[in-house]
Amino acid sequence: MGRFIFVSFGLLVVFLSLSGSGADWPSDWSSYDLYCYRVFQEKKNWEDAEKFCTQQHTDSHLVSFDSSEEADFVASKTFPVLNYDLVWIGLGSVWNACKLQWSDGTELKYNAWSAESECITSKSIDNQWFTRSCSQTYPFVCKFQA
């Protein structure tokens, strides 16, 4: 009987330790490299899209990219839903006219500027970035750390 309790307790400890290492994001979000992402088809201006993202989950913002691989992952989620449409990303000079920064405060490490150069959209098929008036409306992608 003591052996049964010992084995049962051991299995319980293993189960509980593994249960916290699984998906820690909502089921309607996608994950990549410890972050969660969700494409929203509803069109909003940049400021409203950012505000909407902050209301979806703690520390959620419009998407920021640290690498081309992350941008490719987001494109793989946006293109099937939006085809060739543009989406708002978190890069903009809304709060700081001289320095572009991501809306979540991270520094700009990766960029994919088009030949054009206010608020920034990303083309869902090839990750090219385009400036657009912040008052225009586009679909958008939100991101938070899992």
Swiss-Prot record:
The leader peptide range reads 1-23
Keyword flag Transmembrane helix: no
Task: Tell me which Gene3D superfamilies the record gives.
Answer: Mannose-Binding Protein A, subunit A (3.10.100.10)
One Pfam family hit: Lectin_C
Domain (C-type lectin): residue spans on this chain: 32-143
Q: Which domain of life is it from?
A: Eukaryota
What tissues contain this protein? Answer: Expressed by the venom gland.
Task: Report if keyword Lipid metabolism is assigned.
Answer: no
The subcellular location is: Secreted
Cystine residue pairs: C53-C142, C119-C134
Which Gene Ontology terms cover its molecular function?
toxin activity
Keywords attached to this entry: Disulfide bond, Hemostasis impairing toxin, Secreted, Signal, Toxin
Q: Name one cellular component (GO) term.
A: extracellular region
**Which family, according to UniProt?**
Belongs to the snaclec family.
State what this protein does: Interferes with one step of hemostasis (modulation of platelet aggregation, or coagulation cascade, for example).
**How would you summarize the oligomeric state and partners of this protein?**
Heteromultimer; disulfide-linked.
- What name has this protein been given in UniProt? Snaclec stejaggregin-B subunit beta-2
